[in-house]
């Protein structure tokens, strides 16, 4: 009888142990199954994320059409020039952005930037204290030049700003050259008669050579571009020298991010020689260097 009871107890114990083993195996099997099912799902999600195109931010670039060799419409109706082709090259090197060029009068560019109609200005813009008060600039200059007085070839009476007192001097509204003249007038009781230009840059030659105005101020590279017939001349010492940069909205995080990205692209363009080649092709000299060659 005791033997029978003992055998019965041993049988119950064996079944209990077997049951525990079965539960553990089931749990492990369940975990393995879940992991096996989760792995392909995670792989599929990762693959989908990899296949999803990176986000591209559209950037509206403001430029002009009236500056020969810089930003103008060619004989085929195409917008081109140094600034235009350079910004296209920068766009090619920044896959996270897509640049959309919008043209407008030069005098409207900075206002359009302020009102967020455009995101940056590309129009050989000089950095100066007046502009720095309202706008932000990238750090890596893509050109550098000097401003001087420009007069008719046969004019030997003008050599300095003081000689422009009582004279008509042509300049573009909101330009760096206009600010030189306006600052002079603030200190000299509006001695210079500033005439703000409405036409294209090459209209300067006809206005000066015809005597409608007496002079203008221009960067050193500009003269051979707008005056191939050599009717004008640059005289006197340089009035200012400046880095040429892109202009952005101030205190704007997205603008700063874009500015930093453009700086990186310009460094690449300088390093591989592309920037210098574009300058020589369009402007006749490498004005990307500190000293014009």
Regions found by a protein language model. Give the residues of each.
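Extended ligand-binding regions for polar small-molecule ligands
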Residues: 84-94, 155, 162, 174-175, ...
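Ligand-binding clefts/hinges and TM-proximal coupling segments of bilobed small-molecule sensing domains
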Residues: 48-51, 55, 97-100, 176-196, ...
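A ligand-binding cleft/hinge motif common to bilobed small-molecule-binding domains
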Residues: 108, 125-134, 180-185, 206-241
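C-terminal motif of bacterial Sec signal peptides marking the signal peptidase cleavage site
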Residues: 15-19
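Short helix-initiation/N-cap motifs at beta->coil->alpha
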Residues: 99-111, 156, 194-206, 242
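Extracytoplasmic small-molecule ligand-binding "clamshell" domains
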Residues: 48-124
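Acidic, polar ligand-binding/catalytic clefts
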Residues: 100-163
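Periplasmic-binding protein-like
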Residues: 65, 143-151, 228-264, 285-293
